[in-house]
Curated annotation (Swiss-Prot):
<dbReference type="Pfam" id="PF00572">
    <property type="entry name" value="Ribosomal_L13"/>
</dbReference>
<comment type="similarity">
    <text>Belongs to the universal ribosomal protein uL13 family.</text>
</comment>
<dbReference type="GO" id="GO:0006412">
    <property type="term" value="P:translation"/>
</dbReference>
<dbReference type="InterPro" id="IPR005822">
    <property type="entry name" value="Ribosomal_uL13"/>
</dbReference>
<comment type="subunit">
    <text>Part of the 50S ribosomal subunit.</text>
</comment>
<dbReference type="InterPro" id="IPR036899">
    <property type="entry name" value="Ribosomal_uL13_sf"/>
</dbReference>
<dbReference type="GO" id="GO:0003735">
    <property type="term" value="F:structural constituent of ribosome"/>
</dbReference>
<dbReference type="GO" id="GO:0017148">
    <property type="term" value="P:negative regulation of translation"/>
</dbReference>
<comment type="function">
    <text>This protein is one of the early assembly proteins of the 50S ribosomal subunit, although it is not seen to bind rRNA by itself. It is important during the early stages of 50S assembly.</text>
</comment>
<dbReference type="GO" id="GO:0003729">
    <property type="term" value="F:mRNA binding"/>
</dbReference>
<keyword id="KW-0687">Ribonucleoprotein</keyword>
<protein>
    <recommendedName>
        <fullName>Large ribosomal subunit protein uL13</fullName>
    </recommendedName>
</protein>
<dbReference type="GO" id="GO:0022625">
    <property type="term" value="C:cytosolic large ribosomal subunit"/>
</dbReference>
<keyword id="KW-0689">Ribosomal protein</keyword>
<dbReference type="InterPro" id="IPR005823">
    <property type="entry name" value="Ribosomal_uL13_bac-type"/>
</dbReference>
């Protein structure tokens, strides 16, 4: 019997919505990364994008455990000498709700063209409203 390999034309991408209110950052991110890759499906093939679209609402209410709200740091560099900037989780959530979740999920996905296509299927919104009601996303409870 031949090994099954999914074809991109045969894959159907479903839409799911996740309410992130009072959910822990890492637990949501790991489940989202798994579903973006498509590893929850029986037709999973590593070199084909078999994942689903994920819409996350209320990302501003995500939480972290312990003292990580102040201790967890995000770094970026301007490219100039001495141009490193550090931001903690609390400030990141206040300024850009959901960006911490996007960075966490992106770090869990493969690097390269396939991983870049997977991260485009993630839609994160800080509030309860999202513009994807036409896709009729199913509620996914984590």
């Amino acid at each position: 019997m031949k090994t099954f390999s999914a074809k991109p034309a045969d894959v159907t991408h479903e839409w799911f919505v996740i309410d992130a209110t009072d959910k822990v950052l890492g637990r949501v991110a790991s489940e989202v990364a798994l579903r973006l890759r498509g590893k929850h499906k029986a037709i999973y093939t590593p070199h084909v994008d078999t994942g689903d679209f994920i819409v996350i609402i209320n990302a501003a209410q995500l939480r972290v455990t312990g003292a990580k709200a102040l201790d967890k740091m995000y770094y970026r560099h301007s490219g100039y000498p001495g141009g490193i900037t550090a931001t903690n989780f609390r400030d990141m959530q206040a300024k850009h709700p959901g960006r911490a979740l996007e960075k966490a999920v992106k770090g869990m996905l493969p690097k390269g063209p396939l991983g870049y296509a997977m991260i485009k299927k993630l839609k994160v919104y800080g509030g309860a409203e999202h513009p994807h009601t036409a896709q009729q996303p199913k509620v996914l409870d984590i």
